[in-house]
Amino acid sequence: RVCFFTNNSSKAAEDYIEKLHKMGLDISRDEIYTSGEVTCEYVNRVYPGASVFVMGNEKLKAEFIRHGIKLSEDNPDLCVLGFDTELEYWKLYRFCKWLNKGKPYIATHPDLNCPADECPMPDIGGMILFINATISRNPDIIIGKPEREAGEGVKRKFNLPANKIAMVGDRLYTDIAFGFNNGFKTVLVLSGETTEEMVSASDRKPDVILPFVKDLIK
């Protein structure tokens, strides 16, 4: 079985299905899993019935609504930081005000940037630093790769033990660290962010290193 797991909480699963179909891959909805989905599952399990201030775009908000979670920017029970591609300054300020009052603080993932053609896009990692510099708070929990909560979500979703799962990715600090943190086999592909020099300098070595994802089937 195959699962495409993405930390990008600004996209819906349907966006990735469309993208992968254009690449010639016959992928079903059940084979896509996002950090936004795992976050919703976590909120429903740990904070059932809670209202949530979602710092994210409309697609992430729709994911929370799909999971039956009430959204509120007026006295929410907890706050969730997502990859907000519709960021507004005063929305960020309201978010900080609730965090400053001690509301539980969840981040969907920790990535510093999101790959883009001309220049990497600022991602949640930068917003975490921004908020910490403003009110001296870090997330109480981060959900996506490389954290264990996402790994537990994958195991629950596919009803598989850790030793039956292999993590394939191109980032050492999210993808490969995700495998290590959750007891999965790790496969690094060199077609993205990571170079052989970066692997040599890392204290965590992947189980397998391949030039491209397609080499998995050779």
Language-model segment annotations:
Residues C3, S9-Y33, E37-K218:
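Asp-based, Mg2+/Mn2+-dependent phosphohydrolase catalytic module
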